[in-house]
From Swiss-Prot:
Coiled coil: none annotated. GO terms for biological process: cellular response to oxidative stress. Keywords: Iron. Belongs to the Fe(2+)-trafficking protein family. Monomer. InterPro entries: Fe_traffick_prot_YggX, Fe_traffick_prot_YggX_sf. This is Probable Fe(2+)-trafficking protein. Could be a mediator in iron transactions between iron acquisition and iron-requiring processes, such as synthesis and/or repair of Fe-S clusters in biosynthetic enzymes. The gene is yggX. It comes from Escherichia coli O6:H1 (strain CFT073 / ATCC 700928 / UPEC). One of its GO terms (molecular function) is iron ion binding.
Length: 91
């Protein structure tokens, strides 16, 4: 059975996560405030960041950078800047 939450990112009611996807207090916040749709948008950005910046998830500094980008994107409304990438609608 799906749960409905008010998604902080989308600013509307949406389907919530089925379980906590990220550890710790930040994970609890994501579970309670971020919808499946918003999380999918983040995953797309995250993949681009990892690939373009050649991040290694075994490197603690790279994980910290990615986590900060996630917080900025999901909770602070900041767009993820990926060098050399131009969104389709801005071409």
């Amino acid at each position: 059975m799906s749960r409905t939450i008010f998604c902080t990112f989308l600013q509307r009611e949406a389907e919530g996560q089925d379980f906590q996807l990220y550890p710790g207090e930040l994970g609890k916040r994501i579970y309670n405030e971020i919808s499946k749709e918003a999380w999918a948008q983040w995953q797309h950005k995250q993949t681009m960041l990892i690939n373009e910046k050649k991040l290694n998830m075994m490197n603690a500094e790279h994980r910290k950078l990615l986590e900060q980008e996630m917080v900025n994107f999901l909770f602070e409304g900041k767009e993820v800047h990926i060098e050399g990438f131009t969104p389709e609608d801005k071409k």
